Design a protein with these regions (language model features):
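Catalytic cores of secreted/periplasmic lytic hydrolases that degrade extracellular macromolecules
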Residues: 2-229
Length: 229
């Protein structure tokens, strides 16, 4: 299953490149954004997305390095892969980072150091260290991220937004992600702190929004693309 996920995401990451390339091929034409925004060239849309994504990757990398500066090891989270995966799965990167902090201090504490299971997917109270090590170990942190994002989309973010889930972290069957009674409070405290003291929120919303609009350009070019004057 995880190998299949890895293949799917690898293909999706390639698809991002193809999306940028195909959008860029619409040279000499203009992109018509939502009402209230100026019409700009398709080339500028591609450039804007690449710049925004790069800024978001840098901001995430800085956030991870700053938070784990106290640790005796570097966080195993790759900022570039994290950003691209969150964009493709359409999951708020602030939620992902908040859970990574609560579950394993961004991968530098607890069993995650040995299992790569940064978000503790499948790890429940009562399981022994041996059970966790043997049954919930991932070959790489990237595979752990994919399993986590897949779980969120299948079981938690089905009919609710990220904020709604973080205030009541139960799945479609009403089962909690964690047994800690203050789990949601911890997540929201970190989330709010990120919104107040970093530019992650602004960069995330702009990057995700522009990516989604680029997809619409390709799916319905007759609505969004016209000849330049």
């Amino acid at each position: 299953m995880l190998q299949l996920l890895a293949i799917l995401v690898a293909a999706s990451l390639i698809a991002v490149g193809v999306l940028l390339y195909r959008t860029g091929r619409l040279s000499g034409q203009t992109y018509k954004p939502p009402e209230g925004h100026d019409t700009i060239s398709v080339e500028d849309v591609v450039t804007a997305y690449q710049v925004l994504e790069a800024e978001l990757i840098d901001a995430v990398d800085y956030y991870i390095e700053s938070y784990t500066a106290w640790a005796d090891r570097e966080s195993p989270i790759d900022a570039r892969f994290l950003v691209k995966s969150c964009i493709l799965y359409d999951v708020d990167i602030r939620m992902v980072l908040a859970q990574a902090r609560v579950e394993s201090n961004l991968g530098v504490s607890g069993m995650a150091v040995k299992t790569n299971n940064i978000w503790n997917v499948g790890v429940y109270d009562g399981k022994t260290h041996r059970e966790i090590h043997d049954g919930y170990r991932f070959k790489t942190p990237a595979l752990a991220l994919l399993a986590y994002l897949d779980l969120l989309k299948r079981r938690y973010l089905v009919t609710r937004s990220e904020l709604e889930v973080m205030t009541d972290f139960v799945d479609v069957d009403g089962r909690r992600y964690a047994t800690a009674q203050n789990y949601e409070l911890q997540l929201m405290s970190i989330y709010i702190d990120m919104c107040k003291h970093t530019n992650l929120g602004v960069l995330w919303l702009e990057t995700r929004g522009l990516y989604q609009h680029m997809r619409m350009v390709l799916e319905h070019p007759e609505k969004h693309v016209g000849k330049s004057r």
